[in-house]
Each structure stands twice: as structure tokens, then as C-alpha cells.
Amino acid sequence: MGNAVLISNKPKWCELIAIGQKKWELRKTKPKLKPPFKVYIYETKEKAFADIGIYGKTKDGVRYNFVHRIGKVIGEFICDEIREVYQCNSGWVAENACVMRREFFDYLGIPQDTHFGYDKKAYAWHITDLKIYDEPKELGEFYNLCPKGFNDETNYACYRERGLKLRFCKYSKNGKCDSKLKIPPQSWCYVEDLESVSR
């Protein structure tokens, strides 16, 4: 498990986060990390959005070019609290996570025009200490731990199992087995905090 999280978000949600309107991030699951922990924001690629030249300002008045950030890690925040939210919390979700009632029900998989499904829940991750990068980061700058890795105690090299062969993966200062991210997560994944990794 890494010591931070990377989330994938559509451009419209990234824009709302960047301008300070979206204060809570909605997810179906939550990490095993205890708050507070760092969350990196990856902005997904959407052609329709990319064709529009949109500029805005963050809550600090910084000009934000939304188009040139797609397909990159645009910023980070600290998640200091996670709340469980249910169908009956749709008003709170609309106000704080900028997700309308119908969108929230669709996200939870609750059929339209139904009052059932109160047991279905999502998790609201609180967004604090938001930083939008002047220069977005590439996905390949982030490391995800290899699930089948183990440490060689003699030289602290890190290896990954490939069939019957052991293939050299990467040296790591702290002896952890890790690899660069190549594709963004569907929702989120564990990563190493860039500030704690010296490569």
C-alpha cells in the first residue's frame, strides 16, 4: 500500500475542485489509509471538453487553463475526513460535492423514481489544503506498488515475479517494490507520496 492516493476525475469535476466550489469528493470506496492523507488529482481525457478553450480562476485568483491539463495530474489536496453518505443525504451531496440528486442516485445504482436503496452508500472525501499545479505532472511521475514484489535484503533491490523468472524492477531507497503508473485508475489507487520518494 502506498502512503497517498491518486484519483481519476472528469474535467468538469476538476474545474469545480480547482475553483473551490467542490469541497467533497464522492467515491464508492475509501482507502485503508487513515486521514489525513494526500490525494493527487488526475484529470481524465474527454474530447468534447478538450475542444473548448476554457479558462477560469481558482479561489485564490490564479488563472487556470482547463484544456491543457487533461490527461495529467493537475494538483493535490489533503483528505482530512471521510464521511459515509446515503440516498437520504442527496441534499448535502448536491451542496458540498456538486452532484445533483439524479446523478447521485445513478452513481449509487438506484433506479429512477424509487425510494428504495437507502442501504447503498458512498464515501465523501473532504478536500482541504488544495494545491493546483502551475505545471501539471505526468502520470509516469507516480509510483504504484507491485503487488507481487519482494525485497532482496542483500542489496535492497526490488524484484517482480514474472513466471519462473525474477525480473529486475527498480531500486528503491526504502526497499519497497514499485513501478511507474502507465494508465490512470478507474476510480483511485494507492501511490507513493512524491515528497517522500527520492529517485
Region roles according to the model:
Residues M1-R199:
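Structured alpha/beta reader/binder surfaces that contact nucleic acids or chromatin modification marks
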